[in-house]
Amino acid sequence: MTFKHYDVVRAASPSDLADALAQKIREGWQPYGGPFSSYTDDGAALIQAIVAEGDVSTPVVVKPTGGEGAVISATSDPGYYFVVVLAGQSNGMSYGEGLPLPETYDRPDPRIKQLARRSTVTPGGVACKYNDIIPADHCLHDVQDMSRLNHPKADLSKGQYGTVGQGLHIAKKLLPFIPANAGILLVPCCRGGSAFTTGADGTYSDASGASENSTRWGVDKPLYKDLIGRTKAALKKNPKNVLFAVVWMQGEFDFGGTPANHAAQFGALVDKFRADLADMAGQCVGGSAGGVPWICGDTTYFWKQKNESTYQTVYGSYKNKTEKNIHFVPFMTDENGVNVPTNKPEEDPDIPGIGYYGSKWRDSSATWTSQDRASHFSSWARRGIISDRLATAILRHA
């Protein structure tokens, strides 16, 4: 049996789940496995995977230009894109160590694309060139290539390669709020271990972007040239494309540099980015580069516990900048005050019922992302609370 579509149904109670599943079955879906419990910003939730062999008629509510919401098919091909740039360091990219689930929870969507960087769409897959528009999946084409760091339990024949990021899931949560004929184009520009006040500059080429050994942010440095170059390339793909937001998650490696200089250098980078986009203002949300929000995500509890004062110096500098259209999104805890899960093995357990294996299987430097396991958010956090809060912030401020 070959399945063509994968999705999930979420509900707050068994009766709500039954009603939602009944509707999905009428649309051509069928349950896949059994339901399990999870936790979101709204509290406990029941989640059921669903699959379909043929075409489905899943309706979604989209935001029209005026009037009531309209119900449309979720499988239409995009005619243009809302561009979302992803930049910063490791927690902004695919550093979730739990097993990727591309057939279910990390299933790509035909309306979500990315700008290519690597020579193939997936390892050993279809060839692509730098800045081509290609499908987006769980392990995006960032400056640092995470596609080679496979989970010990991965079945590569199922596409379970690499590590898990939040980019795809941010885009999935934005889709219901954009026009039916539009898609999301992700522009991945993150580099793990990068900082403003320490690190190597690396090199930059118009043909391939920043070199993988580039770990220094700053105005006109290779990582910046990569960021602005790929953003412009995404907009030039179609005059209808709109720059929707920049999602920025960075600061951890400035703990070991000169933290007091971080805020000024970040501010200068944002100013330069907006100035360099002045000639494309008509393709920016709000009609100007300054109208494009910078959504700045928090880090894990590990870094705050490591050095509280340095955490406040670096991450506190993202706060109280709403007048500059820079917005901080907290991730230290969930709505119940519980630490947001990380790659620490006890925070990322196996779920055998859905074929999920957590981070404990990455038990050496050959497979883990860092020996400080709590320094990065887990795969489930990226699928859930991280992407939930980032997508909400984009919709609120764009």
Label each residue range with its predicted role.
Residues 1-65:
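Terminus-proximal functional modules
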Residues 62-398:
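Cell-envelope and extracellular/periplasmic
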